[in-house]
Amino acid sequence: MSEESHPNERHMTPRKLFYLALGSVGVVYGDIGTSPLYAFREALKPVAHDGVTRFEVISLISLMIWALTIIVTIKYVLFLLRADNDGEGGTLSLLALLMKTANGHTAILMLLGLMGAALFLGDAMITPALSVLSAVEGLKLVTPRLADYIVPISVVILALLFVVQSRGTGAVAKFFGPITAVWFLVMAAAGISHISDDYGILAAFNPYYAVAFLLHEGFYGIVVLGAVFLTVTGAEALYADLGHFGRRPIQWAWFLLVFPALTLNYLGQGALVLGNPMTMSDPFYLMYPKWALLPVVILATAATIIASQAVITGAFSMVRQGINLGFLPRMEILFTSETNTGQIFVPSVNAVLFIGVIFLVLGFKTSDALATAYGISVTGAMVVTSIMAFEFVRARWNWSLPVAVIALAPLVVLEMIFLGANLLKIHDGGYIPIMIATAFTVVMWTWRRGTAILMEKTRHTDIPLASFVSSIERKSEHSPAQVPGTAIFLTSDPESAPAALLHNLKHNHVLHDRNVILTIRTINKPRVPSHDRYRVEQISERFSRVELLFGFMESQNVSQALATLRKTGLKFDIMSTSFYLGRRKLVPDAKSGMPHWQDRLYIALANAAANPSDYFRLPANRVVELGSHVII
């Protein structure tokens, strides 16, 4: 699960490597690239109550540099990018991989994975609000008269960002990498130009200052860590977007551009404050001369929009994974590109994110206030990923327990300290990401649990398919009439006679010439090769069982898959084929195994789920739905 996961990388030309690395700069590093706008400013606040000292400034920059080194470089760039699921990364991808080898603690792993996904979705709300606000706030330095318009301008920018999602971003996405690369170069140049303000800032490379500061400051040191962590927000994107770019391009972009640019910019901000303590109110923008402020604000706004776009796209992708893995109900998914199936738009998710983002902007009003709420979701997601990575190296790489503990325990402890520091901000807005993540976790856990209970209940009343076929194939005077054509019955249980088939016989008293029992199954791999897509079993002269396999990153286009299946010899004409779907009317039961409120939530989610004929892209004029009541 390392080099072999991206075999094409071995033969990647320098030109392709360059363009993939450039593309990753915009998508993968957009979020972490906006952190200099506010991270150092926020870290200064807890220690600036009685004036900031030289030791404190150098120590804060030291903490930031070493946070980037340990958490981003060592954990993500060098380690986690190798822990992939057939080339794909991300929390749910890692969960899908671990579910194959989980021994006795599946529920714990699943809950951890769902928490990580929920925290990421919370991050997808906070990132656009914080990033755009922090960029637009630079207008205050251009002219103070614009101070009252920062929130309205931010709302307009964010509204436009969410409105254009339905049209896709393929046409402009090719500019994301170059624009963000320019952003990093501008930040690096600003940092270099100010390091000469006080070369003493270079002492920040010595970890002594970071450690001594924490030991000296005590409680204030812990508080500061919450702000220092803003330096590494966005690191999860490195892992989540692994499948889009591959390991080597992401690593090259980090070491050759992103890491040096971030380090130089933070050093420049530190030297600026050492040379002029009055600049600590906004050290990022005050690095630039007056004439450059407006262009930098415009560039910063573009960079934050790109970062926000990357997070929103990541949320869409994660939701699709969640649906395919059975953690979320079916939702309408629109494809915004004819050639790239990864470019999707999920209207319901877009609406939820938009409402949440606007609420955050209007509620917090400034990036200062919102930054206090930001760290919890990110640190929480990182802790979850580290714990799951521990399980990964034990199960997949066969590391011994002592080796795994020695390698990963320090990272987990460090991230737990960061999480504890961020939890101190609960009363200042830190409760917001906790509430968002809790809500998403409850929804996903309820859907998974409710679906399992429903399948277990229906299995007790279902008729085994083999018995049904054996009975129906016996010729008698009571045999149903046979009609020409093909009937395809969708079912989640290939071993039982589908409810739609039984209802069709009960009400219409007919059986088609050819009857296909179709099951759609998502496997714990991102993609399925076309030659492994289907499994066909002929049960009798008139009945066959077909299983279509999809990866959790794939669109479940059943019509297209069946068209391919015809080439193997399964004869049917799509225009003389009817698709029979069962539609269940769920009724809550006091003995369901879930609390009553959870029953109600599950039923509400089921009722809101997208129509299966739309989700599976079945021809609308060939679909027949037959309903039934089911007590859950």
Swiss-Prot record:
Annotated localization: Cell inner membrane
One Pfam family named in its UniProt record: K_trans_C
Topology of the protein relative to the lipid bilayer: Multi-pass membrane protein
GO molecular function: potassium ion transmembrane transporter activity; symporter activity
Keyword Ribosomal protein attached: no
TM stretches of this protein: 17-37, 60-80, 106-126, 146-166, 175-195, 210-230, 254-274, 292-312, 344-364, 370-390, 401-421, 426-446
GO cellular component: plasma membrane
Catalytic reactions of this protein: K(+)(in) + H(+)(in) = K(+)(out) + H(+)(out)
Keywords carried by this UniProt record: Cell inner membrane, Cell membrane, Ion transport, Membrane, Potassium, Potassium transport, Symport, Transmembrane, Transmembrane helix, Transport
Key word Metal-binding present: no
Function noted in UniProt: Transport of potassium into the cell. Likely operates as a K(+):H(+) symporter.
Family: Belongs to the HAK/KUP transporter (TC 2.A.72) family.
UniProt protein name: Probable potassium transport system protein Kup 1
Organism name: Rhizobium johnstonii (strain DSM 114642 / LMG 32736 / 3841)
